Amino acid sequence: MPLIALTPSGEIAIKSSRSRRRFERILIKNIGKVIRVKSYKLDQGIIILNTDDDYSKLSKVFGISKYFEVYEFSFSSIQDIVNFVKDRFNQTVKGKKFAVKVKRVGNHSFNSMDVAREIGNALYPYSLGVDLENPDVKINLILRQDYGYVYTTENDGPRGFPVGSTGKTVVLFSGGFDSPVATWMLMKRGVRPILLNFELGGKVQRDLVLKEVDVLKQWSSNNDINVYFINGLDVTSKLVNAEPSLRILLLKRIMYNTARVLANKLRAYSITTGESLSQVSSQTMINLYVTEYDIDLPVFRPLIGFDKEEIIQMSRKIGTFEYSSKLPEYCVISNKSIVKSQLDKVLEEERKIEINYEELIKKAELVRI
């Protein structure tokens, strides 16, 4: 019965042994939340899983570079290796061109080229020949001192770091194209997201947001994703007397400050947004500066250099496009905008607004996905 082998992402592999072990432990724990693992072992940079579950789910587990189905065997001579591979793969290469690649660790009376050559000679009569550049079948061997693994097909993982390995962030999550993609990108870096949504579109918006979160949950290694819903209409009602051209920036500052308070409460050490430089008037460089002024947490904007088409393409890859494309834009507070705001004027208007952020969070509805 085959086993499943996987290689952690290259960024994990190059870390110190102590850090690497920590990331590997979290990765293995996350894998166990996605598929049933009967047992596992760490083998010189490779994780070997014994599972009878659908291992294709590993394609959405961050921290994995490659995963593949392997056959394990023991040997005491080069002929033992050749016999095992010949018996296992003689029908696989039938009518096809093949190549053999060998990686070897240990002290042996033979080298990797010897093994590849002998296996090639043994399989040649069953095949259409050897093609080292573009084979139909590539037979890969990983050899240790007296045992090894053999496999033919590698599958790509999403790489990155395991979700939950690098901290938490509060995401300003509107549910449009941008914020789900930004969330996914932080998850790829090992971050566990806490989503903060200001409801401006009622049940339609909420239902679509929750469907997007269901998609993101597939990438979270089944770690819970918490969504805090805040009544956005209660917030916008406080802006009716504010300068119309500054209302959008004032609303964004309220969102940032709410995220800051929530982050401090939940021991998250950053805020994440889906903002892209100059995509809209509120996202010019000066307006981003004004928006995050005096926010004492790092603000991550993973999409800052992406254009809208690139973001939409990523949403298709992730799986959130279907729901993001149905979400209307809610512009309920002002038809005016300003591309170059003045900090002192924004702060002057802000001082006129009375908001108790602790109370705002206390009234928020928490949905755990």
From Swiss-Prot:
Residues 52-154 form the THUMP domain. Pfam families: ThiI, ThiI_fer, THUMP. SMART domains: THUMP. Keywords: ATP-binding, Cytoplasm, Nucleotide-binding, RNA-binding, Thiamine biosynthesis, Transferase, tRNA-binding. Its EC number is 2.8.1.4. GO terms for molecular function: ATP binding; CCA tRNA nucleotidyltransferase activity; tRNA binding; tRNA-uracil-4 sulfurtransferase activity. GO terms for biological process: thiamine biosynthetic process; thiamine diphosphate biosynthetic process; thiazole biosynthetic process; tRNA 4-thiouridine biosynthesis. PROSITE patterns: THUMP. It catalyses: [ThiI sulfur-carrier protein]-S-sulfanyl-L-cysteine + a uridine in tRNA + 2 reduced [2Fe-2S]-[ferredoxin] + ATP + H(+) = [ThiI sulfur-carrier protein]-L-cysteine + a 4-thiouridine in tRNA + 2 oxidized [2Fe-2S]-[ferredoxin] + AMP + diphosphate; [ThiS sulfur-carrier protein]-C-terminal Gly-Gly-AMP + S-sulfanyl-L-cysteinyl-[cysteine desulfurase] + AH2 = [ThiS sulfur-carrier protein]-C-terminal-Gly-aminoethanethioate + L-cysteinyl-[cysteine desulfurase] + A + AMP + 2 H(+). The keyword RNA-binding applies. ATP binds at residues 172-173, 197-198, 252, 274, 283. Pathway: Cofactor biosynthesis; thiamine diphosphate biosynthesis. InterPro entries: Rossmann-like_a/b/a_fold, ThiI_AANH, ThiI_fer, THUMP_dom, THUMP_ThiI, tRNA_STrfase, tRNA_sulfurtransferase_ThiI. It is found in: Cytoplasm. GO terms for cellular component: cytosol. It comes from the Archaea. Belongs to the ThiI family. HAMAP family: ThiI (MF_00021). Catalyzes the ATP-dependent transfer of a sulfur to tRNA to produce 4-thiouridine in position 8 of tRNAs, which functions as a near-UV photosensor. Also catalyzes the transfer of sulfur to the sulfur carrier protein ThiS, forming ThiS-thiocarboxylate. This is a step in the synthesis of thiazole, in the thiamine biosynthesis pathway. The sulfur is donated as persulfide by IscS. This is Probable tRNA sulfurtransferase. It comes from Sulfolobus acidocaldarius (strain ATCC 33909 / DSM 639 / JCM 8929 / NBRC 15157 / NCIMB 11770).
